[in-house]
Amino acid sequence: MSKLHFQPIKGQAREILTAILESPEVASCKEEEIQVLRLACEEIIMNVTSYAYPEDADGFLDVDIQKTDRMTIRFEDGGAPFNPLEQEKPDTGLSWEKRRIGGLGIFLLRRKMDDVRYAYVDHKNILTIEKKI
């Protein structure tokens, strides 16, 4: 199990994603699995680094990665409470010009992962994703 801690996180999205993808758990996956995990992790990281904390706050992001018969990645931040799973799903039947901005990344995340869970515990957002591998 890999435990990663990042602080500060502002402007560090690429470094955070690279560290996750280079973890022994993720790096040992098949290329197709890595690409799906990359998409999911990138969406979560961008949301946390862009929106979780006020502009002048450093903030932190903890990431726990565990590989068994499934990959489990747990993201924990101390930002404002935000459950991405409660957001309105985008209307994918509309053309992109008519579709409202936002929500497509989380929509894709939910479609690509086998399980996505959110909890707010002890003033922390905890988002866990799982993918059978």
Name each model feature, range by range.
Residues 1-3, 49-133:
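Conserved beta-strand-loop-beta-strand hairpin that lines the nucleotide-binding pocket
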Residues 2-31:
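Helix-loop-beta hinge of the Bergerat
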Residues 13-14, 34, 38, 58, ...:
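Short, structured helix-loop boundary elements
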Residues 20-42, 46, 98-100:
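Conserved short strand/loop->alpha-helix "switch" segment adjacent to the catalytic nucleotide/phosphoryl-transfer site
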